[in-house]
Amino acid sequence: MSNENHEELNDQLIVRREKVDTLREEGIDPFGEKFIRSISPEEIETKFADKSKEDLEEAAIEVSVAGRIMTKRVKGKVGFTHIQDRFHQLQIYIRKDAIGEDAYAIFKLADLGDIIGIKGTIFRTNTGELSVKATEFTLLSKSLRPLPDKYHGLKDVEQRYRQRYLDLITNEESQNRFVMRSKILKYTRDYMDNQGFLEVETPVLHTIAGGAAAKPFITHHNALDMELYLRIALELHLKRLIVGGMDKVYEIGRVFRNEGTSTRHNPEFTMLESYAAYEDYEDVMDLVEGLVSTVCKQVNGTTKITYGEYDVDLTPNWRRIHMADAVKEYVGVDFWNVTSDEEAHELAKKHDVAVTEHMTYGHILNEFFETYVEEKLIQPTFVYGHPVEISPLAKKNKEDERFTDRFELFIVGREHANAFSELNDPIDQRERFEAQMKEREQGNDEAHGMDADFLEALEYGLPPTGGLGIGIDRLVMLLTDAPSIRDILLFPTMKHRD
């Protein structure tokens, strides 16, 4: 911003504050009281769209409306303004002799961005525009700062994220996207409820960071003098509830991971996790397919959508493929016939797949998949059969114990869900926790810790269970064609300004 523009902005701020002082000197509160609205600009548009000028004159319908001033022009004793409420604008016609000299003086002091209340009658102008002829004018809130770019929106993308309130005032697409987010959450809950799941709440503060491979945020409880972790997953507490006999449960809540940010990652984000007793990962595939396709149809009116450059068909009967088969199909490497960790390391070197010393067969297969396959899965695809090394909470596959009964859902090259037949053998679970702790000692700081209380719960008996995790934010991105996770979080995490 140039010095001249900076001074101009300061001048505007000063003038608006001077107007506040002027109003107060006249005994007028610039930040008014409750105002009862009888109708919104949107309702006027829809209810009276087919009414003629003569119809409205004869009916003389009195209304009470409120909104933010977006345009204003005054000529002598007559003025026009457009007020906005949720991106529906309504023209207000104001005459000095109709609202009185004092009220008209206040109107003349009004600036773009001020919030006003109007009482009057609906009419149609000679050009056919639905309007309200004011009989009363009330200032409800004085705007001390001018709206950006003459209310045409914020040009600076980062400013949109930092000052979301301005983005919502000036960007209809952004506001609509957040309305859709709320609907997606509602329809998701409706679907889960209709499938017989019970919504529950579990702790945000954990004594052990478990349920996912991620770095936690650490805090300290002063009274108990103990370290606690903001949860990185919902899983382990929900599975305790299955042990307790709550057969089908789900939770939608915030989780926290002390990791980097990107167009797909925010340190705090919203997860849906669900667990159903006596089911397996194939049942969960059916649940996910039904949930995503149903919610998509409810918010978009169709299961065929566009995301960026891709046309995506979410109609059920999605593709299902084993991870080893996917690597064989897309890369030409057959991991079914790899018999040792050494052979896997040689393949990684040959195909330029980055690996570390502690990685074994399963880690390397997964690295091949993430390097060469994941981004190619545009249409909804369930990839199942994840290696046991990267799935410490999933049940081993009976036919080949190198793999687990686990799947991830990929759409437009991104993971959208993670699910498995839950490991319910407490002895096997303890061994896997121990293996994870060895990985941590070897430098994998995202490996799971030992959760003794969870192991004790498993020892009382966890029935066969199908578990699911869906990233709500990525689902919202997909269904609203949002390029960045910051576009669908009202207040994304941002680095401090210098």
UniProtKB/Swiss-Prot annotation:
GO terms for cellular component: cytosol. Belongs to the class-II aminoacyl-tRNA synthetase family. Its main location: cytoplasm. This is Lysine--tRNA ligase. Its EC number is 6.1.1.6. InterPro entries: Aa-tRNA-synt_II, aa-tRNA-synth_II, aa-tRNA-synth_II/BPL/LPL, Lys-tRNA-ligase_II, Lys-tRNA-ligase_II_bac/euk, Lys-tRNA-ligase_II_N, Lys-tRNA-synth_II_C, NA-bd_OB-fold. Homodimer. Mg(2+) 2 binds at E415. One of its GO terms (biological process) is lysyl-tRNA aminoacylation. CDD domains: LysRS_core, LysRS_N. It is found in: Cytoplasm. Binds 3 Mg(2+) ions per subunit. It comes from Listeria innocua serovar 6a (strain ATCC BAA-680 / CLIP 11262). Signal peptide: none annotated. GO terms for molecular function: ATP binding; catalytic activity, acting on a protein; lysine-tRNA ligase activity; magnesium ion binding; transferase activity; tRNA binding. It is an enzyme of class 6 (ligase). It catalyses: tRNA(Lys) + L-lysine + ATP = L-lysyl-tRNA(Lys) + AMP + diphosphate. PROSITE patterns: AA_TRNA_LIGASE_II. Pfam families: tRNA-synt_2, tRNA_anti-codon. Transmembrane segments: none annotated. Keywords: Aminoacyl-tRNA synthetase, ATP-binding, Cytoplasm, Ligase, Magnesium, Metal-binding, Nucleotide-binding, Protein biosynthesis. Mg(2+) 1 binds at E408, E415. Its cofactor is Mg(2+). Gene3D superfamilies: Bira Bifunctional Protein, Domain 2 (3.30.930.10), Nucleic acid-binding proteins (2.40.50.140).
